[in-house]
Amino acid sequence: MAHIEKQAGELQEKLIAVNRVSKTVKGGRIFSFTALTVVGDGNGRVGFGYGKAREVPAAIQKAMEKARRNMKTVALNSGTLYHPVKGAHTGSRVFMQPAHEGTGIIAGGAMRAVLEVAGVRNVLAKTYGSTNPINVVRATLDALDSMKSPEMVAAKRGKSVEEILG
């Protein structure tokens, strides 16, 4: 598992995984490389990209471009989550819950990279099932998408934020 971190302007870019894959043809095997990257602004915007090319740098470049194009905004509560969330994609399931200031990011592998670039600073997280990096990234983003801020809940119910928070 390779980790490269770059700051492009205000975007943080992280390389999660590079993998060599092969296509078998009549004359033997053709090798190519895949790269999985995440990009975020550290303030609630995050995206991931998956690139494939004959050379590693080209695969990474393609993945970074796709990640920048596919960015989403997630609701954050001063560096942590609003409430516990679950996410799933194929065989991977993730669970994340908010943590107090000073806890840090307690998460493994691909999930940690997504949370870091998204701007989450304090969270407790666990991966269940498959730990395939692509599926874990997708499950993590699914969980972050399912999170609702008190403002969103209040608007949906037609109430004020004070009524929602009690």
UniProtKB/Swiss-Prot annotation:
Organism of this sequence: Photorhabdus laumondii subsp. laumondii (strain DSM 15139 / CIP 105565 / TT01) (Photorhabdus luminescens subsp. laumondii)
Family affiliation: Belongs to the universal ribosomal protein uS5 family.
UniProt xrefs under InterPro entries: Ribosomal_Su5_D2-typ_SF, Ribosomal_uS5, Ribosomal_uS5_bac-type, Ribosomal_uS5_C, Ribosomal_uS5_N, Ribosomal_uS5_N_CS, Ribsml_uS5_D2-typ_fold_subgr
Keyword Ribonucleoprotein among record annotations: yes
Protein name: Small ribosomal subunit protein uS5
Species lineage: Bacteria, Pseudomonadati, Pseudomonadota, Gammaproteobacteria, Enterobacterales
Record flagged with keyword RNA-binding: yes
Function: With S4 and S12 plays an important role in translational accuracy.
Pfam annotation, one family: Ribosomal_S5_C
Molecular function per GO: rRNA binding; structural constituent of ribosome
Keywords per UniProt: Ribonucleoprotein, Ribosomal protein, RNA-binding, rRNA-binding
Domain of life: Bacteria
Example of a GO cellular component annotation carried by this entry: small ribosomal subunit
A single BP term in Gene Ontology: translation
Free-text note on domains in this protein's UniProt record: The N-terminal domain interacts with the head of the 30S subunit; the C-terminal domain interacts with the body and contacts protein S4. The interaction surface between S4 and S5 is involved in control of translational fidelity.
Gene3D superfamilies given in the database record: 3.30.160.20, 3.30.230.10
Positions of the S5 DRBM domain: 11-74
Assembly behavior: Part of the 30S ribosomal subunit. Contacts proteins S4 and S8.
Gene behind the chain: rpsE
